[in-house]
Amino acid sequence: MNDDILQAVYRVILERKANPSEQSYTASLMAKGIDKILKKLGEEATEVVIAGKGGAREEIIYETADLFFHTLVLLGYCDINPDEIYDELRRRFGMSGIAEKESRDR
């Protein structure tokens, strides 16, 4: 798996946040705040679900890319580096779902 593209997109998102432009979709989302970002993220998640139900491979890929992008926008807005997400996934890797859930409940 190649996470370089995710880091590259994340860097652009941070650049748009730091130096907003009227021409930037990302900057416009950031300017509208967390509620708009969350609304868009929810819409994209729903579109992934619909694409998954439809089963069309290309549609699933397209909509998942949108979901990843908008997730990165949320992370950028909240100053969370994707590396923190990767670290959490590494922590969970090899752990059963039941064991992972129990570790959260303590």
UniProtKB/Swiss-Prot annotation:
Reaction equations catalysed: 1-(5-phospho-beta-D-ribosyl)-ATP + H2O = 1-(5-phospho-beta-D-ribosyl)-5'-AMP + diphosphate + H(+)
Gene Ontology cellular component list: cytoplasm
Alphabetical list of SUPFAM superfamilies matching this protein: all-alpha NTP pyrophosphatases
InterPro entries registered for this protein in UniProt: HisE, PRib-ATP_PPHydrolase-like
Main EC class the enzyme belongs to: hydrolase
Matches recorded under Pfam families: PRA-PH
A biological process from GO: L-histidine biosynthetic process
Top-rank lineage group of the source organism: Bacteria
Family, per entry: Belongs to the PRA-PH family.
Protein name in the entry: Phosphoribosyl-ATP pyrophosphatase
Species assigned in the record: Geotalea daltonii (strain DSM 22248 / JCM 15807 / FRC-32) (Geobacter daltonii)
